[in-house]
Amino acid sequence: TDFQLSIVLLYGFFSAAIITPFAIYRFLTGATAVGILDTVLVTVIACVVVYGWKYGETERTGKFLVVIGSLGALLSSEMLGVIGVFWMYVAIVANFFLTTNIRFATVFTTAVIILLAITGKSFDNAALMWSFLATSGLLAVLSYIVAHQYERQRANLEHLADTDPLTGAFNRRVMERELHLAVEENARKGT
């Protein structure tokens, strides 16, 4: 939908605008490996967003951004230690809004949180790890709830926009959509 595309575009724009200065800073301070990671993240995110915008593949684009953002936050956490863990919180929230497939976002987010905790390089001690697990788990649950509620409300509003409130019959909007689909199918079949 157009709303999903706008989320993808805004994510791409703000990711590039915010991560790019960090990449420059990393190179200037001698953290070349992290600077390269940041540069690769910005480049890949920008390319994926342009693809989604050009071809209208918002769901595929959103899923790919979930993977890229999460893995980028994971690698950043591993390379920078506890300072990099803060990027994981951004990834957790973004994951539930970049794709309408909430199950995919849930599974991938959970896997990345557990993987970060298992590797343990990001945390100085067990207390930090358990604190991260508690806060990231809570944030993931709350993000899931908000994304699920948003999806339900969007579906309800779409249903209301498609039906006549008095009769419950489908309205002109549905007819135009069905006519468009019929014309496309007719063109494909060549009849």
Please place each PLM-identified region on the residue numbering.
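Hydrophobic transmembrane alpha-helices and their membrane-interface boundaries in multi-pass
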Residues: L5-V82, Y89-V93, A111-I114
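Short helix-perturbing small/polar motifs within transmembrane alpha-helices
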Residues: I92-R103, A140-H148
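The cytoplasmic-loop to transmembrane-helix boundary for the fourth helix
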Residues: L98-L116
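Loop-to-transmembrane alpha-helix initiation sites
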Residues: A127-T135
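Juxtamembrane or sensor-core-proximal signal-transducing alpha helices
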Residues: A134-A161
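Conserved nucleotide-binding and Mg2+-coordinating catalytic segments in signaling enzymes
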Residues: E158-H180
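Active-site-proximal structural segments of metal-dependent nucleotidyl cyclase/transferase enzymes
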Residues: E178-T191
